[in-house]
Amino acid sequence: MMHFVPLFLVCILSLPAFQATELTKCKVSHAIKDIDGYQGISLLEWACVLFHTSGYDTQAVVNDNGSTEYGLFQISDRFWCKSSEFPESENICGISCDKLLDDELDDDIACAKKILAIKGIDYWKAYKPMCSEKLEQWRCEKP
């Protein structure tokens, strides 16, 4: 039994580390810089919206009003992505909702741009009450 414990620890410690999915304000700002200014929405506004929407967690999943919202941008399976929980989705973004849960954000940003073009920033409910003014706190200040 004594030989089993060290062997077990070696096996556990040799497993690959999982990449963190909760990002910082600066990492988010850098990762989504291509959406800055799109439809008139600044990077500071996005940093605020994403903090209040998903807590900068790329794997956030929230059930809300009969649909499920996925990822950093909290994109709903009711209209925008396809999920097994809501198979009748319009899937306007043409993407599996599961793809919105990885750390590859290009597809998330492309879908967010579609939502922004169709619905506007008010799609993200945090925008008006939390992110329409006093945005300097969302600026990334790298030392």
UniProtKB/Swiss-Prot annotation:
All copies of domain C-type lysozyme, residue ranges: 21-143
Any GO BP: lactose biosynthetic process
Tissue: Mammary gland specific. Secreted in milk.
InterPro entries: Glyco_hydro_22, Glyco_hydro_22_CS, Lactalbumin, Lysozyme-like_dom_sf
Signal peptide from the UniProt entry: 1-20
Keyword Secreted: yes
Main subcellular localisation: secreted
Membrane-spanning segments: none
Positions annotated with a glycan in the UniProt record: 65
Keywords assigned: Calcium, Disulfide bond, Glycoprotein, Lactose biosynthesis, Metal-binding, Milk protein, Secreted, Signal
Assembly and oligomerization: Lactose synthase (LS) is heterodimer of a catalytic component, beta1,4-galactosyltransferase (beta4Gal-T1) and a regulatory component, alpha-lactalbumin (LA).
Job of this protein: Regulatory subunit of lactose synthase, changes the substrate specificity of galactosyltransferase in the mammary gland making glucose a good acceptor substrate for this enzyme. This enables LS to synthesize lactose, the major carbohydrate component of milk. In other tissues, galactosyltransferase transfers galactose onto the N-acetylglucosamine of the oligosaccharide chains in glycoproteins.
UniProt family annotation: Belongs to the glycosyl hydrolase 22 family.
Name this protein carries in UniProt: Alpha-lactalbumin
Species classification: Eukaryota, Metazoa, Chordata, Craniata, Vertebrata
